[in-house]
């Protein structure tokens, strides 16, 4: 099951050329970029691991691409994404996020249903990948 989080998530994987164009856009708008990775793909896992330091005041997209390549090389079977942060007063938020690397096999999620009093149903998601210990999931 393909993980769909962030911008472009329903499109085919971006090529390096397409990623470079998005990074050039991020730099041209004066946004700060950072690279993050995880092996826990749960949709509510918003705390991915930060790769290096955030790239503030970067004037060249190749610096961000270098960090992406380094992360891909060190974590080839992890999800890797780029975030663009706008520090403009009143916004001060992540304005763009997209996945740039995925594991070769994405096992998907288990939907668990529980019955509660009053015929109430509660649902939860469980990633099949998290059945293995952290660092050995893919």
Curated annotation (Swiss-Prot):
Q: Which domain of life is it from?
A: Eukaryota
Question: For this UniProt entry, which segments traverse the membrane?
Answer: none
Q: Which residues form a coiled coil?
A: none
In Gene Ontology terms, what is one molecular function of this protein? ribulose-bisphosphate carboxylase activity
Q: Where in the cell is it found?
A: Plastid, Chloroplast
Q: What else is known?
A: In this alga, in contrast to plants, the small subunit is encoded in the chloroplast.
Function, in words: RuBisCO catalyzes two reactions: the carboxylation of D-ribulose 1,5-bisphosphate, the primary event in carbon dioxide fixation, as well as the oxidative fragmentation of the pentose substrate in the photorespiration process. Both reactions occur simultaneously and in competition at the same active site. Although the small subunit is not catalytic it is essential for maximal activity.
Query: What protein name does the entry list?
Result: Ribulose bisphosphate carboxylase small subunit
